[in-house]
Amino acid sequence: MKQFGMILMFWGVIMNAQNRKTPKDSITLVDKVEVKGSKKKMETDMKMSVSVDEFLASSDKISFIKRGAYAWEPLLNNMSTERSVVTIDGMRIFGACTDKMDPVTSYLESNTLSSIDIKSGQEGSSHGATIAGSIDLKRKSTPFSLEKKWNGTYQTGFEFNNKQFFNLGNISYSGKKLVVDGSISFRKAGNYDDGNNKEVNHSQYNKFNTGIGIAYKTSPLSSVRIDAIFDMAKNVGFPALPMDLWLSRAMITSASYRQLFKESLIRSWDTKIYYNTIEHYMDDTKRPENLVHMDMPGWSTTYGLVSSVSLKKEKYTSAIELNMYNNTSIAEMRMYPQDRKNRTMFAYSWPWVTTRFAGISMNNNWEISDKSRLSFGVSLGLNYNESKYVEFNWIFHPGAPQQKTRILPGLHAGYQFTENNFSFSVGTGYGHRAPSVSEGYGYYIYNSFDRYDYIGNPDLKNEISYETNAGAGFKNGKMSIEAKVNYFYIQDYIIGKILSLGSPMNYQSVGVKAYTSLDHATLFNMALNAGYSILPELHWKGTLTYARGRDDKGKNLPFIRPLSYLTSLHFTHQNFGVQTSVNGDFIQRNYSPEYGEDQTPAYAIWNFSVNYTFNIKKLKTVFQVGAENLLNTYYSTYADWGNIPRMGRNIYTSLKFNF
């Protein structure tokens, strides 16, 4: 009944809204989640101490697999990270954990972001071959200034449920020739309690992140910039896994050159070279119940080049991008009874796999008229893999080649039309992706969700995606409503199937699965977003999403989000703000027992926060207090690994200074 009431409220506000004419707007097929310099959106729409994961979750295209309170795995269009491209300022970065406990999003903090650019399907193929799309995390970059300026923020706070203490700081200097951006952050959290006030063991984490960027103007139309990020996480627990993270370190560096042009077909040229290295050490020494201990260290090193040119001629614009990178991924398994000196087993779960990629893409926009726009693009990539220790692959795939080269094409096209306050869009796409390192070369990678060891297959075919999308919307000065749908038909869909040969290596495993290709799979996603200005100071927003995924036998795919909703009210008056929201999922009816899922019940969560803005001398100060899961509901979702319960009631406070 709670969920039914929420839907009635959702539609009731829409149906009673009054239309007022305002200048026309348009729907684009690209979602951009903006974080302005003052972060006004963050201060009013959600808690100020929001993480990158929590901020990404505000997009209707993003959901998460959660194995604990830290480093959630982002799912774009309900597809796992193998099918999407996640970058930082266009740079390719690959995690070093076979269990996906270090997604790219875990190597930044929210105080370093300026925006997050989310592109769906083949529109996201600029930075590499993809099926689901791309997520580009854009870091802050202060522009040059005619006058010397110093700006900064400092934010601190405390969350009571898991006793999390955090500090976030930013500082920037800008002048005519020189810009310097700096950031630092630290978070320390203990175990959290669920809705039954029971402690969830192994859910603690510690995270430190810092970064610097220096830009220098070499001429009125050109500049150079160097950037560096250092991220370290220690003592991170994962309650859904049989082991935890002892240490993770990442160093991400880049140097770039930007050239602008006056009154020319070429408007700008940007070139960047980059290098990043990640080390990730998992072990189970804090799990005394494990009969045999295991260390799982991993290393990932990537260097690459991104070069893009922007063109404009009257109503035509184009972006051409060259993308090249080289990655080496290594992961080990080391078993021992109690003493590391008495090692009983060693194996490479990633046997020194090198991936080299070179691709070029072209994305075009043509303003046909004031009411219509055509977008189209093409990409072509060359993907090369090599396994140094190919004998691990020969155990299950005798004679498999040590090297593999694949051609990865992509196409997309879309049309947008606006008339008065209405807007419409349609689009289509076609693209290939290569198997990931785990899918192609993984060796006995334990999946604690279905309790199988997974084996890669170097001879897997490319996944091939055929997609369609459409959207329709209405917007005036008082209300807005937008509906979006997309459909993916994925040929040679890669997934794990039970292998009759071989026995499990992990004593917790129930068997062995090998990655194989289904004939096809289908995915459908729908999102409905609406907003209504009840009063100048009072605004309502609502979102309704639905997805369905099936394999070639008509069976359900795993980790597909059930019908879900979010409804929120935001009140602001002078320096005072109040926000409240209810979000939840309906019962998960289309779950997949074959892939380890069980049915998760419906739930509804109520959140509430209050913030006040004031000045301390020349410092703009914001104080916020709020509560998540105010009713202390006990629940877990379809995407909680092993049905680990979510956090119960969490009271939080935050104080932010701007200067």
Q: Predicted segment positions?
A:
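Gram-negative outer-membrane beta-barrel transporters
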Residues: 367-374, 382-383, 486-490, 506-590
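Transmembrane beta-barrel wall of Gram-negative outer-membrane proteins
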Residues: 162-188, 198-234, 245-267, 309-313, ...
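Outer membrane beta-barrel strand-and-loop segments of large Gram-negative receptors
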Residues: 211, 296-308, 349, 353, ...
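Short acidic/polar hinge/loop motifs at secondary-structure boundaries
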Residues: 92-121
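Outer-membrane beta-barrel translocator/receptor signature
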Residues: 111-115, 124-196, 203-210
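Flexible loop and strand-edge segments within Gram-negative outer membrane beta-barrel domains
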Residues: 20-21, 189-190, 201-203, 207, ...
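Conserved C-terminal beta-signal and adjacent last beta-strands/turns
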Residues: 208, 215-218, 416, 422-423, ...
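N-terminal periplasmic accessory domains that precede
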Residues: 21, 45-56, 72-75, 87, ...
